[in-house]
Amino acid sequence: MVLGNTRVSLMIEDNCLFCMIVKGQLPSYKIWEDENYLAILDIFPNIKGQTVVMPKKHLDSDAFALSDKELTDFMIATKKVANLLVTRLDVARVHVVFEGMHTDHLHSKLYPAIGLSRETKQAIAPEKIYFEEYPSYVTTLEGPRAKDEDLKRLQVTIVGFRKRNKNKENSD
């Protein structure tokens, strides 16, 4: 279903975990709220203070399918919560992820960088990982050094695709 430029899932409210939380039908640990958005502590955190920010209105989990205004409003709400975490948890930064694979309701996940020095330092994990296909989760671990010829081929694929789409848009 499309509402404006935004896809709205037909899994409306009755079966949506986040809609039930917004309605107060499921318990949550609310840390911030305004008229349109809600932020709760994640009950499955991998770091203290991990937070989920969600719109109160049920929207498809693909953040980049939103209209520019909807995405901007959502990012502003996410930023407000990130700033709250920075201040209250006394952290240098908060990292944000839009994945939306587990729950089909638009949301961002915030990860307070507890223990990160306020001075910028290069931190590289010793382990490397690479996936041929998306494994249904996100990691920021680096992979092995990609081959230049593979990167060049991928660059041509992406740039060529973009140019073809621009030409198609201009012909419509």
Language model segments and positions:
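HIT superfamily nucleotide-processing domains
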Residues: V2-D172
